[in-house]
């Protein structure tokens, strides 16, 4: 299917959304796909509210881009660092951050920039451009996915044809748009380790803030006599946690290789030097 036909199909889907329950939410993350669905919503002429749920850990320049796009900003009840102080760092298997910071309902009908092309998991999970999601507490939201079948090439062509300005993370030093780049929470455990290291290199102050927040969590757990297995493995040291999670495939492998070296190798100094952290 050509891009023009995909655009027509997307606009028809948006225009078909019932308005009996009021304004339609355009779920805006600041990423390239949300820029595309925002532009499509404008082209479709629907009554919408573009809403950005501030995760408090998006890359530098994201918030400025959100405001430049005229998108409404909703602040979380609790920011990410406070969550870490209370619950520790999220993992691939325990992602409490998503539910609390961005995956919560606002309006009963919502448009999302999900694409099956993004990952095998999404391709398996999303089969149709319309679905009903039930959130914790029983709240139901009808979700619409107008670019579900779009490829990266489709997104790139649409962005360039419509002259859409995307977030800074999508441009190289010469100002060229790179559709393969991603915008997500800095340090997200779902990203691969190389990508996470690159994100922290771009945002070293955020890494330092997360280390301090995790250290607060460890200190409280240790004082209460309730240290987690990960805390014990890391010797109650948040720098060790980040070193292990960013440079090793698992904490088990880190433990096997480095337990006897913890006090011979200054991990904190290494991390500060690697990520160019200046106090």
Located regions from the model:
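ATP-dependent adenylation/nucleotidyltransferase module used to activate substrates
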Residues: 1-162, 279
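ATP/NTP-dependent adenylation/nucleotidyl-transfer catalytic domains that generate, transfer
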Residues: 22-23, 167, 171-279
């Amino acid at each position: 299917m050509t891009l023009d036909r995909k655009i027509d199909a997307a606009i028809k889907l948006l225009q078909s959304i019932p308005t009996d329950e009021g304004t339609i939410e355009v779920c805006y993350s600041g990423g390239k796909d949300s820029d595309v669905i925002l532009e499509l919503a404008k082209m479709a002429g629907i009554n919408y509210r573009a809403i950005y749920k501030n995760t408090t850990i998006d890359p530098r320049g994201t918030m400025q881009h959100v405001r430049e796009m005229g998108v409404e900003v909703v602040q979380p009840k609790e920011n990410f660092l406070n969550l870490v102080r209370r619950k520790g760092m999220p993992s691939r298997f325990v992602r409490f951050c998503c539910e609390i910071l961005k995956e919560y309902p606002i309006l009963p009908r919502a448009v999302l920039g999900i694409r099956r092309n993004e990952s095998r998991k999404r391709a398996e999970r999303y089969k149709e451009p319309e679905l009903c999601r039930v959130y914790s507490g029983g709240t139901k939201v009808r979700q619409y996915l107008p670019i579900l079948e779009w490829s990266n090439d489709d997104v790139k062509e649409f962005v360039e044809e419509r002259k859409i300005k995307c977030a800074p993370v999508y441009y190289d030093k010469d100002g060229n748009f790179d559709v393969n780049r991603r915008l997500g929470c800095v340090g997200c455990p779902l990203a691969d380790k190389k990508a996470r290291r690159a994100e922290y290199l771009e945002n070293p102050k955020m890494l330092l803030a997360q280390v301090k927040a995790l250290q607060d969590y460890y200190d409280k757990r240790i004082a209460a006599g309730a240290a987690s297995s990960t805390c014990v493995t890391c010797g109650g040291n948040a720098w060790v946690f980040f070193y292990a999670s960013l440079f090793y495939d698992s904490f088990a492998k880190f433990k096997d290789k480095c337990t006897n070296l913890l006090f011979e190798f200054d991990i904190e100094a290494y991390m500060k030097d690697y990520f160019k952290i200046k106090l």
